[in-house]
Amino acid sequence: MKQYNAIKGKYPGALLLFRVGDFYETFSEDAIKASKVLGITLTKRGNGTASETALAGFPHHSLDTYLPRLVRSGLRVAICDQLEDPKSVKGIVKRGVTELVTPGVSFNDHVLDVSKNNYLAAIHFQKDSLGISFLDISTGEFLTAQGDRHYIDKLLQSFSPSEVLFCKQKKEVFIEYFGDRYNTYALEDWIFAYDFTYDLLIRHFQTTSLKGFGIEEMLEGITSAGAILHYLNETEHKEVAHITRVNRIEEERYVWLDRFTIRNLELVNAQQLEGVPLIEILDHTKTPMGARLLKKWLILPLKELTPIQERLDTVELLVKNKELTTTLVDELKPIGDLERLISKVAARRVNPREMVQLKRSLERLVPIQQLLKQQDQHVLLKLAEQINPCEYLAGRILNMLKEDAPMLTNQGRIIRDGCNAELDELRAIAYTGKDYLLQIQQREIERTGISSLKISYNKVFGYYLEVTNTHKEKVPADWIRKQTLTGAERYITEELKIYEEKILGAEDKINVIEQKMFQDLVLEAESYINPILQNARIVAQIDCLCSFAHAAVANNYCKPIVEDSALINIKAGRHPVIEKQLPLGESYIPNDIYLDDETQQVMIITGPNMAGKSALLRQTALIVLMAQAGSFVPATHATIGTVDKVFTRVGASDNLSKGESTFMVEMNETASILNNLSGRSLVLMDEIGRGTSTYDGISIAWAIVEHLHNHPNFRPKTLFATHYHELNQLTEDLKRVKNFNVSVKEAGNKVIFMRTLKPGGSEHSFGIHVAQMAGMPTSLVLRANEIMGHLEKEHVREGHEDKLKEVPKSTLQMSLFEAADPAWDSIKKILTQTDVNIMSPVEALLKLNELKQLIK
């Protein structure tokens, strides 16, 4: 335990997996944690003594099963292995931590999700600005940015890091700014010193400055990036040659989506368990790199026209040329995770089977490059020029490694025959030598007349001849007895002993030679890190463009016209997610949206609850963002003037942990929108003010619309859904405000939602009808109708609570024969709608009982 305690002391914040023979053991508090997370048995060592210690473990070959569960629970796991062969040493085996796996730092395929990046983030806090960096060590992607707390919060929401680093002294500030929803780890203050982190970066990239990366002036960003490199060293990840550059997240290139918008629009994650995010509709990628890039394209839509148009034009070509798209997709399917494969090469963690997969992936680049070169389209031609098939490396792997190479280097049969003369000779001894043993066995059978004689092997005695007691009198004098059993004797011969040494020695030498040759091949592959990472980026782009083309064809999307204007003109727009969830045979009802900054800047949309106002708002934002991501859109026509910011205030959510009500959260989000407006903003507001009293809500909503319309500097395009019909009056004074309603049709006492957007305001919310549809008791619905009728009759304007007090108590207890009795009117309605010709006797009795209840 002395050795264990010494190693544990170096990693106090991690759960230590301590290799003991064929098991990984945990002790004390670590054992208790492991037992709970993994569901393994907790035992005790030294039970009842002063040195009693909790103990829990699992077989070493089960590491890939248990490690992911530990890491996903938020634990940092230090893996302590035996650094020497126990057979070759006397006393305690030398041990050491070979890897510290954390939620944000792992190469383990069972911890990682192939379709998602696994980001480690670091934040550096300064008074007026924060720096943030993201690293996915499994792919080598390294990003940095800096800005105010709101921008950093947006990036955290967009990139969803698995682990966040910050200075110990800033823990409370971090929680205040970003909450407690992230796995975090606090580092010492000195690690965030600018000079220290700058030096780490230039030493890693072997440069004299960071100007070539465009981050030289980003002091906070540099500090956060350097802190990440320090953390890699601290977690025993020293082989990181695949981290070849650090990229600046260029805020000016991408549409601003605050964290509320990313959440509300469900771009990559659904809010509800059964929900479907947009990415599930658009993701038809065939490679892991493509799946990861597509997510970035959706959370970082472009603002610049040229790259948007290049994507759209390429998607159009792929839509029209189905043969090209089909062929490209077929070539993409066999390609493995080039980013993570070459990252494992750099980290010296790649296995033989993965090297074969790398070779197969590189081989697919040749036909892809040839296909692209045949196209008369500059984007595809440019991509073709950037592909480097690394044919020499692919050939080296092909000629050296067996196609069915095993996972582990010590399993043998990695290297092809003919690559090494000594290896071939040893294999002849090791593998054909066993045939020679059978020849010895047959010769001795014939020599002795012992028909049951056989040659066997065990680790204690090696190869031996076994003779049953029945025939032991026939044993020749030159045989040497090694073991006596109950019913048999075991012998060896000089010839058998010599050949055994040759066979066993050959197998050991084979492993040594194969491992050395494989390690040399891996070192050779390291020189291809940059071109293979470049290939991965090209393949990912091709994959995403093919994915957009597939979605466009499958879902009947149109190519949007994206231009430098203030216009948004969508004809027959549809919600890309909802239309795919409708029952078979039911079609999505499309709607038109027109916004500009001269005639129709603000659309006030009224209509009943459940009519589809919220879906219309979200659908508009999704169409705009899809267009600026380079995708076709669900509409018959769409002209999109580029937006630079998209704001949404939809849905209700409390933040009770911070003592904030639904209304307070709503006001915070609305204030954030109004304080960050621009002339190219798209603003979506749904039911603002519903969390407070009616007149407070109307007043706030009214003032917000006025503010958006009369802003001295900007005219943000706005969709404003509300159930406050009083807002329809705004069009009288605000010329760029227009009223629309989502229409309904009344049939008796039922409401049919038409889900069609029409000009003009609506005067009814039909809330009571919705309550009836939800299954509210009939008596309650009748009472609600009575109260509403009274309020409408009295024309409630002021003293709302006083008027409510004046509403008479339920008149259901009055005389059944009172002519003005509302209950009697309700009974007449029920009887009118009842078809006695199709009622069963039981149904009739139930209906009679319902009527009886109304007059009690």
Curated annotation (Swiss-Prot):
In the record, biological process GO terms are:
mismatch repair
Any one Gene Ontology cellular component term annotated for this protein: cytosol
Does the record carry Transmembrane helix as a key word? no
Query: Record's SMART domains?
Result: MUTSac (SM00534), MUTSd (SM00533)
Query: Where is ATP bound in this sequence?
Result: G607, P608, N609, M610, A611, G612, K613, S614
Which keywords does this chain's UniProt record carry?
ATP-binding, DNA damage, DNA repair, DNA-binding, Nucleotide-binding
Pfam families per record = MutS_I, MutS_II, MutS_III, MutS_IV, MutS_V
UniProt keyword annotation of Transcription regulation present? no
Q: Which InterPro entries is this protein grouped with?
A: DNA_mismatch_repair_MutS, DNA_mismatch_repair_MutS-lik_N, DNA_mismatch_repair_MutS/MSH, DNA_mismatch_repair_MutS_C, DNA_mismatch_repair_MutS_clamp, DNA_mismatch_repair_MutS_core, DNA_mismatch_repair_MutS_N, DNA_mismatch_repair_MutS_sf
The Swiss-Prot or TrEMBL record annotates one GO molecular function as: mismatched DNA binding
PANTHER family (UniProt xref)? DNA MISMATCH REPAIR PROTEIN MSH1, MITOCHONDRIAL, DNA MISMATCH REPAIR PROTEIN MUTS FAMILY MEMBER
- Its biological purpose: This protein is involved in the repair of mismatches in DNA. It is possible that it carries out the mismatch recognition step. This protein has a weak ATPase activity.
Q: Which family does it belong to?
A: Belongs to the DNA mismatch repair MutS family.
The name this protein goes by in its record:
DNA mismatch repair protein MutS
Q: Which organism is it from?
A: Cytophaga hutchinsonii (strain ATCC 33406 / DSM 1761 / CIP 103989 / NBRC 15051 / NCIMB 9469 / D465)
As recorded in Swiss-Prot or TrEMBL, the protein's gene is named: mutS
